[in-house]
Amino acid sequence: MINWNNVMTTLKGGRVVTVDPASWNMNNPEYAEILKLWKDGNFNTDSVKWTNYYTTQEIETVIAGELNITPLRSWISCIEPGYMTGYHYDIDDNEEEYLKHGLLKRYSVFISNPSVGHLFILGKEYFYNNPQGTIIKWSNYREWHNGINGGLENKYMFHIIGY
């Protein structure tokens, strides 16, 4: 059993993600596509900010065992109050390498306690007030999604991709 509260309080060395093309791999046309969609939709890009933590190897091993998958990548995302991720699909420069393993599977775990204002949209499904530890399986690892924090506490999720 993972103590998610302990995990959240001990996270270090996160990578902040904002709408700053200088920090994106703009050689990958998919980044430009998402940025164009946001600009064309008059999206408030100042509201886009989250932090990814990649020091998740121990958790990855436990969760991958529970899900019976071989992990390729995992991370914890944190959205601070008042921010969101923007509607997007995840772009990974290592995707070609991952696909050599066959069909990819993706799962997300709600690791925060339920809190007013926390919302996760996956395709056409909306998730809110999910109990801590709830696991959802994605139908497509590249599904469009959006995390939103309209609450007063940080919103954390654990994500894992494997085969």
Give the residues covered by each predicted segment:
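Catalytic core of Fe(II)/2-oxoglutarate
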Residues: N113-Y163
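Short, conserved beta-strand element in jelly-roll/cupin
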Residues: C78-E80, E97-V116, I161
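Tight coil/turn sites that cap or link beta-strands
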Residues: E80-Y83, G133
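Short, surface-exposed charged micro-motifs
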Residues: W75, S108, N146
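Non-heme Fe(II)/2-oxoglutarate
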Residues: M1-W75
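A general structural signal for short secondary-structure junctions and capping/turn motifs
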Residues: G65-N68, Y98-H101, F127-N129, I148-G151
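A short beta-loop-beta micro-motif enriched in histidine and acidic residues
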Residues: T70-L72, G86-Y107
